C-alpha cells in the first residue's frame, strides 16, 4: 500500500491498524535542538483520545505515546523520530458479523476490491484510529512552529447538524467536551448527541482550523501551492468530504470588489482569501473549514451485500462516535501544522536570504 506519507522536508509516515498490536509513525526532517518530551505529545493525544466523554466512542485507549528514536536528552537530534502507541482495548468479536459483509458507507467494499483482502476488525487501516499518530507527529510540528516562529494553530467545532455557533471565544474551547467556542451552544450540542444515541444514528459536523502568525511567503507554486497542500492534508482525514480555504464556496455569491482584500500600510483590510494568495501565505491568519460526514457505524439497519454479492442487511456493532467531528478537532490542527511546518522548512531552504524593499504588512 502506497500513500502512507505526507510532506517533503518535514515528512510523516504512519503505520498500523485499528485492532493491530500497535500504531506507529516515523517523522523525518525535524530540525535538531527542539526540546520535546512524550508529555508534549500526550497533551494533544489526550484531546483526541477515545472514551474521554459520553459523547464519543467508549473504546478506552490510553494512547500513551513512546518516543523510540530521534530524541536525546530531551532534544531532537535531527534524525528520524520514531513514535509508537500500543492498542490495548481492541474488541474484535464485535466485528465478526461483518467478516463476509460490507458496511455501507465504509471502506470495506473498496478495500476488498482494491487489495483482494481486508482486515475487517474495526476497519483495519481505514479506521480513524490511525489518526492518533498524525496527532502525535502534528504535536511536534506545533511545538516547533510556536517555539521558533510564534505560529499557533487552533481549531474548534463550529457546527453539528443544524446547530451552528454564533460567536468564537478561544478560551472556551477547552472548557467543554465538544471543543465548542460558544458556551451558549454546548447544551444544544449535548441534547443533539443524546437524541442521536436514542435513535442509534449519527450526524455530520463542521470544523474551523486557524493558523496565526504565519510568515509571509510560504507555498511552492504551481502544483505545491500552500492551499492545495492544506486541502490535500485535510481531505486525507477520515470522513472529511469538503474543504474550504477562506470564504470557500461563499465566493460564488461575492463580487470582485467585495472579495478582494485591500492593502494599506497598516495591513490588509479583510481576509476573504484565508491568508493565502497565489498559493503563497500573505502573513494573515490561515483559515480553513472542513465538513465531516456522519459516520455509517450506526445501529439503524442498512442494505448491503455479502462478499459473494448476495443482498443482506447490516446493523453495525461495536463502539463508535455519534459525531466524528468532535474528536477530529485536534486531528485538523495536526494536519495543518504538518503542512505549515513542511512549507516553512522548504521556504527556508530556498528563500532564506531573499529580501525586498517592500515592508511586510
Curated annotation (Swiss-Prot):
GO MF annotation list: chorismate synthase activity; FMN binding
InterPro entries for the chain: Chorismate_synth (IPR000453), Chorismate_synth_AroC_sf (IPR035904), Chorismate_synthase_CS (IPR020541)
One GO CC annotation: cytosol
Gene3D superfamilies: Chorismate synthase AroC (3.60.150.10)
Pfam families: Chorismate_synt
Reactions it catalyzes: 5-O-(1-carboxyvinyl)-3-phosphoshikimate = chorismate + phosphate
Keyword Flavoprotein included in the entry's annotation: yes
Enzyme class: lyase
Assembly notes: Homotetramer.
Biological process (GO), any one: aromatic amino acid family biosynthetic process
Record's function text: This reaction introduces a second double bond into the aromatic ring system.
EC numbers, comma separated: 4.2.3.5
Family: Belongs to the chorismate synthase family.
Protein keywords: Amino-acid biosynthesis, Aromatic amino acid biosynthesis, FAD, Flavoprotein, FMN, Lyase, NADP
Cofactor: FMNH2
Binding residue positions for FMN: 125-127, 238-239, 278, 293-297, 319
Annotated binding of NADP(+), by residue: 48, 54
CDD domains, per the entry: Chorismate_synthase (cd07304)
PROSITE patterns: CHORISMATE_SYNTHASE_1, CHORISMATE_SYNTHASE_2, CHORISMATE_SYNTHASE_3
Pathway(s) annotated for this protein in UniProt: Metabolic intermediate biosynthesis; chorismate biosynthesis; chorismate from D-erythrose 4-phosphate and phosphoenolpyruvate: step 7/7
Name of protein: Chorismate synthase
Cofactor note (record): Reduced FMN (FMNH(2)).
